[in-house]
Each structure stands twice: as C-alpha cells, then as structure tokens.
Regions:
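Acidic, low-complexity intrinsically disordered segments
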Residues: 55-86
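A short, structured beta-strand/loop element
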Residues: 15-57
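Broad hydrophobic/π-residue packing in well-ordered secondary structure
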Residues: 4, 18, 79-82
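Negatively charged, low-complexity tracts enriched in Asp/Glu with abundant Ser/Thr
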Residues: 1-16
C-alpha cells in the first residue's frame, strides 16, 4: 500500500510505502502531463536508488532528488509508523 506524503503546486504527488522487512521504502513521484499522461519516477530509500523514470527532464529530476534527500528522514519515520499500525 502507498501513503500520501506531499502534493506540490503543479499537482505532483509524492507517496511512499510502509517500510519493507529489509528496511527499504519505495517513494513514487507522479505528475500529470499532456504528452505522457503522467510523468513518474521511483526512488528506493535508504539507498536513493532511482528507477522507472519517465518524462522528467534532468532539471526536474535533480529537483526531486534534492527534495527526497531533504525529506528522507521524515519519509522513513512515517513508513516505520505505517508498518507498526497495519
């Protein structure tokens, strides 16, 4: 299950999974787009491994990478709480 973390002014949604047994957390970013329908990217914490990137420019991706790095501690903490309460 994915849980909301943040919605940006351009309707980009950032959601995260609960923490997996191996300590990883999936962070998914999705932005509505005319050309692609949705641009999207996935980041796995705590390794910051990015995959399944579609439609984002290098500049947009750099912004999201910094945003996730700046908020990873919160996402990880929230994902631990989700795991405890399921």
């Amino acid at each position: 299950m994915m849980y909301p973390f943040m919605t940006l002014n351009d309707n980009t949604e950032i959601v995260h999974s609960e923490m997996k047994a191996d300590g990883t957390v999936k962070v998914y970013i999705e932005t509505p787009d005319v050309e692609y329908c949705f641009k999207h990217a996935t980041c796995w914490l705590p390794d910051y491994k990015w995959e399944d990137i579609k439609g984002y420019s290098n500049l947009e991706l750099a912004y999201f990478k910094q945003l996730i790095r700046n908020n990873a501690h919160l996402i990880i903490e929230f994902s631990k709480q989700r795991r405890r309460f399921r």
